[in-house]
């Protein structure tokens, strides 16, 4: 069985322009505060109350991800949500190449890496 791959900020930075789907699962208020990593897609998973419309989210996800083995990098604030979501995608939906940004966007910013606001 596949498992979630932890990627450091430097590893993620090297993937920015590759054929990798990067999905930021944070909320809009979080995007506004920190920005997002270049070329990542905003796809909020949990709302402020911890709720998620899973069918709608999965529909958007499946439009971005072309195959079950395509590399997907999930991003959140501190890598807590992304581990949960990655496990869900691997165990319940058969994805085999799911990674997440170790330490989340907080770690990315702590290392002085850039984000974009859009």
Name what the model sees in each region.
Residues 1-20, 28-71, 80-118:
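Rhodanese-like catalytic fold shared by cysteine-dependent sulfurtransferases
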Residues 74-76:
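Short, surface-exposed ligand- or partner-binding patches at beta-edge/loop junctions that are enriched
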